[in-house]
């Protein structure tokens, strides 16, 4: 049985290969589909549309430029355009514009009438110049004469009505005309004489008394007649304004002379006070504990004195002294000596050995002054006690200065250096101009 199965196996394999060949030869390509599988399977889809109709459809399918978003209608009805009429609800009249125009025309007519009326009045006024001048002169004579008790009745009865009528006429004419016309008209008719006389009489009667038995002269106000004719109240206010202004200026005249002196001295006071405080700070215990530079300058050969010319070159001293003005530093040194008991500082007068004498322009007055602290030895370094040190500069100290030795540099100018008599009393006849000149020499401020 086993041998038969072995013989049958090759036959079976050959038959299977033949069947596969037959299957492969029977397969063919499918035909091209005539209809799209994604479209509906309606009988109309199989109809063929000619090319000419497709071209017509593409032309009609293009949207129009004007009506791209409009709705297309398939019916055969025709539509005609409509012209809409806008209707606004409200109570406004349709003839509002015409009403405004009519109002404007009315105002224009009124302005023309006023202009004609003013021109007529001006013509009448210029024609009747002689009458107006005579009437005004009568009124001025009536007011200038003193009125008795019996004469008052006659004036009011006979000429009062005419005078009042003339004054009313004048005021009405002035109010109707322009400012320039009224001024010219007043000058031609001689009204300025009447108004100036009344104004001078009022100013003379109303003279203002000032302090120190001074009376102000009445001021002249140009074109005052225009104000007096138009409105008496305005003229009174104008006169009072000028009088008050003169009174104000006369009282404050002395104060204006004093205030510049006060304000010009204020920065000097602040500068001197700040320099004094800065010098006291340099030689204070708090600063000397940390300031090794100043401690190195306390030499035993110079008895601990430091030249003020060196202190004046410090950055803060230059700024506080308004650019390094030595006069301000000398004035602050005087203040330091005035507070000697509290700051424990000493200032001496002397010179530097071997120093060249500078020209007058280059001379620094601080080179002749030296400063130290009373207990300077406590803060001096060990190397400063060598007296044979040739590198250190040596100072020739002449004397220690007292609180009154620097009075010539006082910021007040003349506190304690008045010239005295033989009895030691201060002279009362000291020239104030000399004092001011000395003060300007001592305090030359850098502008």
Curated annotation (Swiss-Prot):
Domain of life per record: Eukaryota
Bias kind Low complexity: ranges: 89-105, 164-184
TM ranges: none
Miscellaneous notes: Present with 861 molecules/cell in log phase SD medium.
Residue ranges of domain HTH La-type RNA-binding in the record: 265-368
Gene: SLF1
Region: Disordered, residue numbers: 1-143, 157-198
Basic residues: bias regions: 106-116
Biased composition, class Polar residues, residue ranges: 1-16, 33-48, 61-88, 127-143, 185-198
Lineage: Eukaryota, Fungi, Dikarya, Ascomycota, Saccharomycotina
Protein name as it appears in the record: Protein SLF1
Gene Ontology MF terms in the entry: mRNA binding; RNA binding
